[in-house]
């Protein structure tokens, strides 16, 4: 926060290091830093535990979870991480951005889409939820027709 100037964005070769007792404490600290000056941007983690990667992606307000990579370089895209090359990362609606991904050439193309009528496919709720209702022994399946 404001009392810790190195917790904000730095466009200089400075590394801020924080200590945490465990993963949950580290996640809480990362969330505080994101909410100060980074909401929507990205979070990096070095781990082999997929559940922790998923937890960060679900719980933190970020558009990118950088896994086992040099965060500084990985957010800008790479041939080996699937992110498009960019010097400008969108932070989604968390930062009132119109994009939540790496700004790249596709954002500057005008693409015309041709739309024609196609046969409609409406969801049949009874069929859609049938397996769930049967597995969970619920009577709600009968009420879907109402």
What is the predicted role of each segment?
Residues 1-146:
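Conserved C-terminal structural/oligomerization subdomain of aldehyde/semialdehyde dehydrogenase
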